[in-house]
């Protein structure tokens, strides 16, 4: 099962692959069941996996920065 394939959620590169896969499924109604579009599907899943790992890395970095910010008391300028 794929994640939400809405265009606003993905990079342009992945959107191109998503659209190619959708076109392949549309043009090959029966052959898609016999693996005709599998290469496009693999490439799309690879792209989505890369997006996911990049988002996860950014989120971890952001979380670590927020934890550091909350655990370190701010310097008082007046004293």
UniProtKB/Swiss-Prot annotation:
Where the record places motif Cx9C motif 1 is 14-24
| PROSITE patterns the UniProt entry points to | CHCH
**What does the protein in this record do?**
May be involved in cytochrome c oxidase biogenesis.
The CHCH domain sits at 11-55
User: What organism does the record attribute this protein to?
Assistant: Mus musculus (Mouse)
Name this polypeptide is given: COX assembly mitochondrial protein 2 homolog
Single GO cellular component term: cytosol
Q: Which keywords belong to this entry?
A: Disulfide bond, Mitochondrion
The gene designation is Cmc2
Matches recorded under InterPro entries = Cyt_c_biogenesis_Cmc1-like
Q: Where is this motif: Cx9C motif 2?
A: 37-47
Identify the stretch(es) annotated as Disordered: 50-79
